[in-house]
Amino acid sequence: MRAIITVMGNDRTGIIAKVSGVLADIDVNILDITQTTMQGIFTMVMLVDISKCSVEFEAFAGILEQAGRDIGVVISAWHEDIFNSMHKI
């Protein structure tokens, strides 16, 4: 099972380190990642494998949201199938 994670906020040191550390703590593997900074705004999209995640999806999303608040960015997570259906034309 896979999920999509988005991260947005003012650029600062340690964003990728914090997010990847949180994912490692709950046994989530990063499959693909893209990130950029546009005029001081950090954006990142990750595709992750949640098949071995140590918590349920709702808790997973909540942990990421809290981590985002801790570092001043917005982090959202969706099941891959829901994300794909939301972004289908």
State the predicted function of each range.
Residues 1-89:
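A conserved regulatory-domain signal marking ACT and ACT-like small-molecule sensing domains
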